[in-house]
Design a protein with these regions (language model features):
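A structured beta-alpha segment of the ubiquitous adenosine-cofactor-binding alpha/beta core
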Residues: 25, 44-54, 64, 208-236, ...
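Short, ordered loop/turn segments at secondary-structure junctions
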Residues: 8-9, 32-35, 63, 83-84, ...
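An N-terminal-biased, well-structured beta-alpha scaffold segment characteristic
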Residues: 1-96
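Rossmann-fold NAD(P)-binding glycine/threonine-rich loop
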Residues: 83-110, 247-280
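Glycine-rich phosphate/diphosphate-binding loop of Rossmann-like nucleotide-binding domains
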Residues: 8-30, 35, 141-229
Length: 280
């Protein structure tokens, strides 16, 4: 059996760690330059992929190119962290291959060692705060100098799942003042346990594990509740998504136009439409 590991379109992540490759008993093939961005050396004595249509199993992380899918052999197995839209896109392109996505794994104890989605979401939350801190022209923590005090940045986080919680924790460790919002009932306790302040909206909190779609009227109330917070924030990070559906728009274009100069928005829901109006 031939197993191939290939790069994502952006090349930032690899579907396998170099140290794990020796554990496989199958015939392993790697795409050339798979670990270049990660600063790992290519493992020795491992074959380079020459033809995709010779591989029985192909693993990637998330962003796979159409030309790669088209070149897979008939009956091949494709493994990755694909959302519902991506799965349908791949199946429409190649109905003759099998697609397995970690995105669809149930959140149960027996499957915890396969929960790649949570690990990636944790990294996303962490990396997004560091990227925002790099992009803003302000310092994140409070600083006391002989010339006076520099106030800490205000960070607003929308969507408090795994990524959002990690973003809160990271921003707090950097010394920011943090506010957060989520429509789920359990989110308030989670936010406050990390030392952040919860933004209240005049909508009914959801009791579900995952956020569910709300009416246009309810969404309008959420936008109004968040408007003042967004305008006053130095950094806004959005993670709000609804499984299998378009991401809710939480920030209107008019709100963005009224934000402070040099403030930063990073929309992590851009792949499903975005939480910020105008996200591309």
């Amino acid at each position: 059996m031939k197993i191939g590991f290939i790069k994502d379109v952006d090349g930032y992540r690899a579907p396998v760690h170099p140290e794990s490759i020796d554990k496989y008993t199958a015939d392993i093939h790697l795409e050339k330059g798979l670990f270049d961005y990660l600063n790992y050396s290519e493992p020795k004595n491992v074959k380079t992929i020459s033809k995709l249509n010779e591989l029985d199993i192909v693993a990637c992380v998330e962003n796979i190119q159409h030309k790669v899918v088209k070149n897979l052999k008939e009956g091949a197995v494709l493994i990755g962290i694909f959302d519902f839209d991506k799965i349908n896109e791949i199946k429409n392109l190649r109905p003759d291959i099998k697609v397995f996505s970690f995105f669809k794994l149930p959140r149960i104890s027996r499957a915890q060692n396969l929960d790649a989605l949570s690990s990636q979401a944790n990294l996303l939350g962490y990396a997004s705060v560091l990227r925002a801190a790099k992009e803003t022209s302000d310092v994140v923590p409070m600083m006391t100098t002989a010339a006076g005090n520099i106030q800490p940045s205000k960070v607003l986080i929308l969507g408090v799942g795994v990524a959002g919680l990690q973003a809160i924790a990271t921003a707090k460790r950097l010394g920011a003042r943090v506010w957060a919002f989520d429509i789920r009932k359990e989110a308030k306790d989670q936010v406050e346990s990390l030392g952040a302040k919860f933004v209240e909206a005049s909508t009914e909190a959801q009791d579900s594990v995952y956020a569910q779609e709300v009416s246009d009227e309810e969404n309008q109330k959420i936008q109004e509740a968040l408007k003042k917070q967004v305008i006053e924030s130095d950094i806004v990070l959005t993670f709000a998504q609804i499984p299998g559906k378009k991401a809710p728009v939480l920030i209107e274009k008019s709100t963005v136009e009224n934000m402070k100069e040099n403030s930063v928005i990073i929309d992590l829901a851009a792949g499903t439409g975005g939480n910020c109006e105008g996200t591309e």
